[in-house]
Regions:
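Conserved anion/nucleotide-ligand pocket segment
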Residues: 149-193, 199
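Class I SAM-dependent methyltransferase SAM-binding "motif I" and its flanking Rossmann-like core
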Residues: 95-96, 103-164
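Flexible gly/pro-rich beta->alpha loop and the following alpha-helix that scaffold active-site loops
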Residues: 65-114
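Short acidic-glycine loop/turn motifs at beta-strand connectors
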Residues: 197-202, 207
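Short glycine-/acidic-enriched loop or helix-start segments at secondary-structure transitions
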Residues: 15-17, 44, 94-96, 126-129, ...
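Structural motif
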Residues: 5-6, 82-86, 117-118, 157-158
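Charged helix-capping and loop-helix junction motifs
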Residues: 47-51, 97-104, 172-173
Length: 207
C-alpha cells in the first residue's frame, strides 16, 4: 500500500484539506508525528511546524507530536499512524533521515499502509532523488553528501513553490527545463495551492 500526500505548502486550499481529511478518516488516524528536523535551528518552534500541528489537530487527530530525528530515536515513528515530513532544508532533512535510520523506518511504515504526508522539502525527499536540488542549489548541500537518493516511496520528482519562485528567480523555468532535457527526468512543478495525492499507482493532482 502506498498512501502519500505531497504538498508544496501544506493544507493551503479547501480541496487539499478535504482530501487530507478524507485520508485521515478512512485510515482511522488517531496519532500523528511531525518530523521537525528540516529547520536546523528553529525545529518545532518554527511557525510552519506549529501551523501544521494546529491543522492536524483541527482534523480531529487526537495526538500530534514532534520528533527530531537528528537527536531523537527514529524508532518512535512506529508509534504513529500518520507521519508528516515538514518543509525546510531538503539536504539537511535527508541527511539526518538517513543517518538516523529513519529512511528504512519510513519505508516500512509506507509498506504497512500507513499515511505519510510531505510539505515542500518533505515532499521532495519522498521521491527518487534530490539531484534537482543539487543542480539548482549546490550551496545548500552543507554536508557535501554525494548520495542524493531520496526515499523513493514514489516515482514523482517534485519541485515545490514553482509559480512563487518564478517571481524571485525568473530563470528557474529555463533551469528546470534544461535539467529535464539533460537527464530525461520529468519534474512535477507544484505551486503553493497544489498537491498530489498518491494511492498505490493512482496519482491525483489537487489544484
Amino acid at each position: 500500500m502506498n498512501k502519500l500526500l505531497l504538498t508544496a505548502f501544506g493544507f493551503s486550499t479547501p480541496k487539499i484539506i478535504n482530501v487530507a481529511q478524507k485520508m485521515i478518516q478512512e485510515n482511522k488516524i488517531t496519532k500523528a508525528c511531525i518530523i521537525s528536523t528540516s529547520w536546523p535551528k528553529e525545529k518545532e518552534k518554527h511557525p510552519q511546524m506549529q501551523q501544521i500541528k494546529r491543522d492536524l489537530l483541527s482534523m480531529n487527530i487526537q495526538q500530534v507530536d514532534f520528533l527530531d530525528v537528528e537527536f531523537e530515536d527514529a524508532n518512535k515513528l512506529f508509534d504513529y499512524d500518520l507521519i508528516f515530513l515538514n518543509g525546510g532544508y531538503p539536504f539537511y532533512l535527508l541527511h539526518y533521515i538517513k543517518k538516523s535510520g529513519a529512511d528504512q523506518i519510513l519505508k516500512r511504515i509506507n509498506q504497512n499502509g500507513e499515511l505519510i504526508f510531505g510539505l515542500s522539502a518533505g515532499s521532495i525527499i519522498l521521491g527518487p532523488s534530490i539531484a534537482l536540488m543539487q543542480y539548482l542549489y549546490p550551496e545548500d548541500n552543507q554536508f557535501n553528501d554525494s548520495n542524493l537518493d531520496g526515499l523513493n516511496l514514489t516515482d514523482i520528482h517534485v519541485y515545490p513553490h514553482f509559480k512563487e519562485m518564478l517571481t524571485r528567480d525568473p530563470t528557474i523555468k529555463d533551469k528546470i527545463n534544461k535539467y529535464e532535457n539533460e537527464t530525461g527526468i520529468n519534474i512535477t512543478r507544484l505551486n503553493n495551492d497544489q498537491a498530489l495525492a498518491v494511492n498505490n499507482d493512482t496519482q491525483t493532482l489537487l489544484d
